[in-house]
């Protein structure tokens, strides 16, 4: 049954049908944990697709099916500054699903590569966070200490604050570190407004930015105004 879906996807010229077949295969893997029999590498042909949805679905399948042959293409998407964010996100999820030392090494090498933009590094840190939260926290702080645009720091903090283990990793790594006042304020604003309101993280951010306790009592609007100066 599942093998037939892969056959139909390969033979169909309709983008909507291709997506329907590939999505059914994706759900079968995610929900029922089953793969089609036969040659799974046939899904690789869809990595040539110009349709982002088809490409992303096929990429997720390649990762979940552990198709190492797809790895170089996925890495290239993440190295290319012109790649669409949708494709980058799918490539990261796929590499995480493949797992292994190759994935961990690739993420870290790209994060520390000075040729990559801050946007690229932020995307990669979000991926690394799912595999190595402590190392991701270390890389994130290094990025936050050198980030040119305070607003960009928000997406770094948000990635950690949404997860308890990640928040703890960032809190531990921040101890004894220094951040610019604006970056620290940005992190505090996000931490203060999050449902979990992590007090330990707020405290180390206050110390890292050299902020006085009174600034903790600023309203959200006042904090935003200070950050945007």
Identify the meaning behind each predicted range:
Residues 1-229:
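Long, ordered, helix-rich scaffold segments
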């Amino acid at each position: 049954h599942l093998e037939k879906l892969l056959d139909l996807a390969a033979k169909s010229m309709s983008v909507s049908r291709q997506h329907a077949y590939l999505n059914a295969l994706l759900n079968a893997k995610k929900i029922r944990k089953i793969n089609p029999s036969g040659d799974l590498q046939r899904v690789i042909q869809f990595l040539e697709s110009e349709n982002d949805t088809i490409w992303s679905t096929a990429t997720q399948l390649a990762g979940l099916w552990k198709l190492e042959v797809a790895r170089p293409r996925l890495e290239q998407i993440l190295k290319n500054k012109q790649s669409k964010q949708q494709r980058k996100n799918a490539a990261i999820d796929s590499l995480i699903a493949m797992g292994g030392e190759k994935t961990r090494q690739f993420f870290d090498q790209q994060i520390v590569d000075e040729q990559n933009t801050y946007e690229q590094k932020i995307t990669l840190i979000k991926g690394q966070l799912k595999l190595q939260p402590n190392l991701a926290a270390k890389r994130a702080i290094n990025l936050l200490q050198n980030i040119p645009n305070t607003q960009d720091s928000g997406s770094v903090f948000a990635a950690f604050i949404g997860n308890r283990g990640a928040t703890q990793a960032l809190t531990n790594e921040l101890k004894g570190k220094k951040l610019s006042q604006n970056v620290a304020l940005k992190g505090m604003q996000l931490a203060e407004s999050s449902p979990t309101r992590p007090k330990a993280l707020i405290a180390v951010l206050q110390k890292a930015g050299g902020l006085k306790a009174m600034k903790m009592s600023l309203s959200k609007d006042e904090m935003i105004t200070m950050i945007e100066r």
